[in-house]
Each structure stands twice: as C-alpha cells, then as structure tokens.
C-alpha cells in the first residue's frame, strides 16, 4: 500500500479512469452531505488563511496489468461518494463557464477534458468515472449533456440539480468556488495487487463512514472474494434483477427487511459456510425466494 497527499483536481487530471466494482453500493449521498461539501468549498475559497480542505481518502487498485499504451482502469475500493459528488459539481460548474478562464485552469473545456473525460478515447473509455449499473448511465448522460435515461438515478440527478442551482445563485462571482475546488485535498491510497486485501481494507474504511445496509453487506460478502468475471455474472443474472425489482426508493428499506427475513430463517443458520462454498447456489436461491 502506498499513501500520498494530493490535490483532488491534480489527482483526477493524472488518473485515466476509475471504475466502481459491482460489489460497491450505489451512489448514496444526500443533499445534506452535498450542502456540507458546498459550504466547505465556498468557505475555503473565500479565506486566504485556508490553504487546503481535506475531504477524505480515495483507495484503489489496478483492475488488471498496467498498460502504458492504453487505459488502465482503477477499481475504487473507497471514495466513490466523494469522487462522484466532485464530478457532479464539476459538470455543473462547466455549464456556467465559457471558454475564457475565470480562474487559473477553470474554463468549460478544461474542466471537462481534465476531470470528466478522456477526450482522445471512445466509448466508455472516454469517461473518467464509471459507476455501477444503477448510476452509470445517468452520470454519463449528464456528462454527455444528453437526456437522462428512463430509469435514471434519482440521487445523481437531485445532487447535480442542487449544485447547478447553487452555482446559479453565485451569478458571475465564481472565483470563490473555483478557488475552493482547487484547495480540496485527499489521501491517494494505491493498493498493491497480490499483497493488500481489498475486502479487509474496504470493511475497515467503511466502519467509520455512512453505515452500509444489510443488503450491501451481504452483497459485498458474496461478491468481493470472487473473480471479476464470476462477480459480473452473478450480479447481472441475479443480484441486479433484485435491485431493480425493489426500486431505487425502496431498495434500502425493503431489501434490508427482505434480507433480515431471509437470513433469519432457521434453515439459514449455516449461511456463512453456505456462501463461502457455494456462492452461486446461494444467490440463485435468494433470487427465487
């Protein structure tokens, strides 16, 4: 593991692409958390005595073997909420800027090409951040500035709208926002493939953050230890249909109740052993339940 201090914008600029693994929970920040970040950014931007504002860590591991000649996706173990929220704010700000820089490095084109896009790549490789299925198409639609998909992510749209409205209230006085964004600081934590245990690190990092739901914990426990292709197959064939069936609004509440009911049955007392030796059978049985 290697941990270094980094400015968020510098970190985004030099990184090619972040991918959120399918075992991660969906984007879950509320307006309250976005408002707190907004207030912190504006405060830092207005005060010369604040040189930096720390917003947390971003922990990642290379998805596969590093390739100099192409995009090398980084799997995000911790920091999805911060990365996604920052990109929603940057996208909203880019729509209020022209081609002239209002502050060093802050023009519509530079914000998009530095922090949101890989402008010389095509398809999904052309985007800095790929979220999980529930959120991915919504974020990409915003960045492409196209209509939202039919089953769009409410969190993505609501938080983007919040930032867009806050920026509109600033009028032409955008320099404090730009200065504040430039002061955001993270801890850049790169894991070593084959040496660090992503599951243990994920669990320890989330022990002090927003509590994971029962469904999130079970999904992570099942999928995180599997090979990527195995993860994808189980998620797309069985877990994703359950998420869709419960819907975005009811996922946490009703899916959690469902999981507690299912795992509370006497017939499931050996659930941990069952999941470890037969994850496919467990997920398929859960899907049919």
What spans do the regions from the language model cover?
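Short alpha-helix boundary/capping and kink motifs at helix termini
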Residues: 1-77, 87, 184, 188
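Short active-site loop/helix that positions an aromatic residue
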Residues: 83-99
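Secondary-structure transition/capping motifs at alpha-helix termini
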Residues: 47-48, 96-100, 208-212
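Phosphate/oxyanion-binding active-site loops and adjacent basic polyanion-contact surfaces
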Residues: 29-34, 50-51, 81-82, 152-160
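Short, compositionally biased low-complexity segments
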Residues: 2-17, 116-143, 174-176
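Aromatic/His-enriched, Gly/Pro-containing loop or helix-boundary segments
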Residues: 58, 63-80, 119-152
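Flexible phosphate/Mg2+-sensing switch loops adjacent to catalytic phosphate-binding sites
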Residues: 53, 97-125, 129
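Polyanionic (Asp/Glu-rich) segments that form extended negatively charged tracts
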Residues: 130-289
């Amino acid at each position: 593991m290697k941990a270094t201090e980094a400015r968020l914008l510098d970190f985004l600029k030099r990184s090619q692409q972040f991918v959120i693994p399918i075992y991660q929970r969906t984007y879950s920040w509320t307006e309250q958390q976005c408002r707190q970040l907004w207030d912190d950014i504006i405060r830092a931007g207005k005060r010369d005595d604040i040189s930096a504002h720390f917003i947390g860590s971003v922990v990642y591991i290379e998805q596969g073997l590093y390739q100099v000649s192409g995009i090398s996706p980084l799997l995000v173990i911790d920091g999805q909420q911060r990365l996604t929220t920052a990109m929603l704010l940057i996208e909203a700000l880019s729509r209020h800027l022209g081609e002239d820089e209002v502050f060093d490095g802050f023009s519509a084109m530079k914000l998009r090409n530095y922090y949101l896009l890989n402008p010389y790549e095509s398809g999904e490789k052309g985007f800095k951040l790929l979220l999980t299925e529930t959120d991915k198409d919504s974020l990409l639609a915003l960045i492409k500035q196209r209509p939202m998909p039919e089953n769009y992510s409410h969190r993505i749209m609501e938080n983007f709208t919040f930032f867009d409205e806050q920026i509109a209230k600033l009028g032409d006085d955008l320099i404090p926002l730009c200065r504040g964004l430039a002061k955001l600081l993270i801890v850049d934590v790169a894991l070593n493939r084959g040496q660090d245990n992503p599951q243990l690190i994920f669990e320890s990092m989330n022990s002090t953050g927003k509590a994971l739901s029962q469904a999130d914990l079970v999904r992570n426990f099942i999928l995180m230890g599997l090979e990527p292709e195995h993860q994808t197959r189980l998620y797309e064939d069985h877990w994703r249909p359950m998420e869709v069936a419960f819907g975005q609004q009811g996922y946490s509440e009703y899916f959690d109740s469902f999981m507690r009911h299912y795992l509370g049955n006497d017939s499931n007392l050996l659930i941990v052993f069952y999941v470890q030796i037969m994850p496919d059978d467990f997920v398929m049985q859960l899907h049919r339940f």
